[in-house]
Regions:
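Domain-edge interaction signal
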Residues: 77-287
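Short, basic/glycine-rich phosphate-binding loops at helix/coil junctions
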Residues: 1-11
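Phosphate/ribose-phosphate-bearing ligand recognition and processing surfaces
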Residues: 9-100, 104
Length: 287
């Protein structure tokens, strides 16, 4: 038996949390009349509906956990381990009034170059494989070299961050183009085996930019080095908008942005990376 849960007014609209709650309440009141002995629930209203699992998950769990039937609740691929734990689902504080999902955007064909880059890195045994932190760095650098991803970046604790890039993960997942797999302590983002890049859809200039970015990605030793590289490039770009960039300005910007880097050891490390990036023509430092 399949039970339809309307979560929105129109298929193109964002989902409404109150519809999800009404549907769950209806199910709790009527499952016995339908002779249901076991049931599986998807993450209602998440995905294209735009509701957050951090709200939907706890509500679904609390509405269904005491029913005397077998219940399975599936989380979206983007949910973290913490967000699927019993402690989180039982105890997190949630807002339930006037909650409406955000509308996921449309698919950007240049994200195929992002998928291609992730695919290349994950298929290279010597490269750092792609998790959520590295994903943001890849998105930033591809955008920085001129790939029109549509992502806008700003400063965050671990380097440049884009809400649009995070949103793109949901769109890619909804199109069955990526999935996540737990490998040790890391959650790896994998490109679906069915994905094959149509190289005829892109120019030689596009591939030149992607290959330049890939050459840099292959140099990521760990998430820390990826953070340093992306942060230096972001800082250089921001400073360049207001004039020339020299080492002192760059160090001041980075250490003001991230106080944990405000020590001699980190400054020396940042300088090493900056000089190497300058030698690779990724940035230009004036005297």
């Amino acid at each position: 038996m399949i039970i339809n849960f309307p979560t929105k007014d129109h298929w193109r609209s964002a989902s409404r949390l109150d519809y999800v709650i009404k549907g769950l309440d209806w199910f709790a009141d009527n499952y016995n009349k339908l002779n249901i002995e076991s049931v599986a629930f998807p993450p209602l209203g998440c995905g294209n509906g735009g509701l957050e699992w951090t709200t939907v998950g706890p509500i679904t769990y609390r509405k269904l956990k005491d029913l005397p039937i077998e219940v399975e609740i599936y989380a979206p691929f983007s949910a973290t381990r913490k967000e699927i734990s019993v402690d989180f689902l039982e105890n997190s504080v949630i807002k339930t009034s006037n909650v409406k999902g955000y509308k996921l955007g449309s698919y950007n064909k240049y994200w195929n170059l992002l998928l291609y880059s992730i695919q290349q890195l994950n298929n290279d045994r010597y490269s750092l494989h792609v998790g959520r932190t590295i994903y943001q760095k890849i998105c930033y650098i591809l955008t920085a070299v001129g790939i029109p991803t549509g992502f806008v970046f700003s400063k965050s604790e671990y380097g440049p961050f884009s809400p649009e890039a995070k949103n793109a993960l949901l769109i890619l997942a909804n199109n069955n183009l990526i999935n996540e797999e737990t490998k040790g302590k890391m959650i790896e983002i994998n490109v679906s085996e069915s994905f094959v890049l149509d190289k005829n859809a892109f120019s030689s200039d596009d591939f030149e930019k992607v290959n330049k970015a890939l050459d840099l990605f292959y140099r990521f030793k760990n998430t820390e080095s990826a953070e340093i590289i992306a942060s230096i490039l972001f800082a250089s770009s921001e400073l360049k908008n207001s004039g020339s960039v020299n080492a002192d300005k760059l160090m001041h910007y980075l250490q003001e942005w991230k106080p944990r880097w405000n020590n001699d050891e980190c400054r020396n490390l940042l300088m090493e990376y900056s000089i190497e990036l300058a030698s690779m023509k990724w940035l230009s430092l004036s005297n």
